[in-house]
Amino acid sequence: MRCPFCGNVDTQVKDSRPAEDHVSIRRRRFCPACGGRFTTYERVQLRDLVVIKTNGKREDFDRDKLERSIRISMQKRPVDPERIDQMISGIVRRLESMGETDIPSKKIGEIVMEALARIDTVAYVRFASVYKNFQAADDFEDFVHELRPPAPPES
């Protein structure tokens, strides 16, 4: 692992343990060249995924991009950050275990929306507004109306 301080490629692992999410390994490293100490996280990647964008363009799957978009939709929501991390790891595992290396961005969006709907409806609507490209307040209203269960008949 390259030292982020001096660029030396010969660093030493001083401590290694499971991370809080129990999906990755946290390693404390030391650089003998500059004395710098830093932490790295390592996680299993089952396969290299490629995202097929709606315009047909292909790009490597970026877990960080997925995480950023989910965290933006979750801003200022009363959801435990560890729960968000678990959700993201679950989404990535689901994508990796689909058996396909090429995954349409639409499929990723559907999986994310499914997960968000179970955790926080406000984050779900926020994500949907970007994913479904809402253009006006009516788009929000229609979407939220679909979420509401039908009113019971009055007697």
Curated annotation (Swiss-Prot):
A molecular function (GO) term: ATP binding
Cofactor: Zn(2+)
Any one GO biological process: negative regulation of DNA-templated transcription
Transmembrane segments: none
UniProtKB keywords: ATP-binding, DNA-binding, Metal-binding, Nucleotide-binding, Repressor, Transcription, Transcription regulation, Zinc, Zinc-finger
Residues covered by the ATP-cone domain: 49-139
Keyword match Repressor: yes
Pfam families linked: ATP-cone, Zn_ribbon_NrdR
Ranges annotated as unnamed zinc finger: 3-34
Co-factor: note: Binds 1 zinc ion.
Cited InterPro entries: ATP-cone_dom (IPR005144), NrdR-like_N (IPR055173), RNR_NrdR-like (IPR003796)
Task of the protein: Negatively regulates transcription of bacterial ribonucleotide reductase nrd genes and operons by binding to NrdR-boxes.
UniProt family annotation: Belongs to the NrdR family.
PANTHER family: TRANSCRIPTIONAL REPRESSOR NRDR
Protein name: Transcriptional repressor NrdR
Organism annotation: Ruegeria sp. (strain TM1040) (Silicibacter sp.)
